[in-house]
Amino acid sequence: MKSDFFCIIIGLLLFSCEQVEDVSRIQLDEISFTQKENVINNSINSFSFDLFHLLSNQNSTENVFVSPFSVSCALGMVNNGASGITHLEIRHVMHIPDSLASSLNNYHLKLIDGLPCLDSSVTVKIANSMWLNEEVLVKKQFKQKNTTAYKAVSQQLDFSKSESVDKINRWVSRQTEDCIPKIISDLSPDNLMVLVNCIYFQGNWQSPFEKSDTHKEQFFCADKTVKDVYMMHQLASFPYRKNECFEMATFPYGNGSYAMTVLLPNVDKSWRECMDMLDGNSWKTWMNDSTDNMLLDVKLPKLLLKNKYQMREILSAMGMPNAFTPRADFTGITEKMPVWIEEVIHASYLELNEKETKASAATALKVTFESEWVPIEPVIPFYANRPFVLVIHETGNNTILFIGKVFYPEK
């Protein structure tokens, strides 16, 4: 499989790069959720698998890699200006109950503040921004909500100038350590704003692979072809689970606050049977099950995956079509009407090698107005030498940061 990548929403420029990358943080042992925030976390994980499945179906023979967390931050920011049916649909896409609508901002803020502080040896950068058309008045309350809850920086730009596109792209490149060098191609004077989220992750394996143990081996692709790829190898103990559809091995980073869990379909099951088992409830059950470290003979392909997605049709199919039409209600953003989401662009990056994992994503959400609307025990062998799913997640609450499928390893 090839990988699909989800990712980043573009952020405001009023904060300097140094402010976003402030390292004088208090170290956290865990992120402690309230009961309401736990419900929202489970809801966002369900949204994560919904998004993954639709992207996977749309790119059925391709790799997929995406950051649902990034997309949820972008949707959370624009939802702060939504009302009526538009507000309802955005929340329902993220599985947020009506009674918890007011808690979504606090949930995101707790993660934006907490995720970078869980492990000093792992780099997690989260940045949000609002890029505003200098010709249009945006409501102060909308900007204040996103500044407070999403730490979003904001800057007014002349959307008629190509320099504005370059400025946004440079900001994204900086926040993603050059993993995402370009997120948008153009701007129009009819665009009201661009909301952006960026997430960058870099973690060293707790148990690294030896380069001398990496060799070319066969990978059995979904289309029945066989490809020679560089396969990393080690014999070590890792958390291991097995059920009727998957073998699951968890590979921790740093102090264990973050990990990558690889879900390898059982050889006697079809890919479709296994995908049908993947949802938020299953993820919660599997991750909460007690498990012992097992001695594994691990083979894992080196990866370098890059992709970009137009998310408008995906998000519309997930249940929020109203936001992409002139019927959308974004009266919380501006008095200027009609206003709607023109496009949502998502770019992602994944690199796996013997030492570390680097993952990044960017989501740019363009809001527009007045333009033409276009619809749209013994040693257990764990050989990831056939298509598999991978999830990069925080381990305390099992919050999903990135999720992907690998059909055809690329390096």
At which residue positions do the language-model features occur?
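Soluble, non-membrane globular domain cores that form compact, hydrophobic packing
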Residues: 18-19, 136, 186, 282-285
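Internal alpha/beta scaffold segment
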Residues: 265-291
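Detector for small/aliphatic-rich hydrophobic stretches
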Residues: 2-7, 14-159, 170, 406, ...
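C-terminal or internal capping secondary-structure element at the end of a domain, subdomain, or sheet
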Residues: 382, 387-411
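Non-catalytic, conformational "gating/processing" segments within enzyme and secreted inhibitor domains
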Residues: 101-266, 292-374
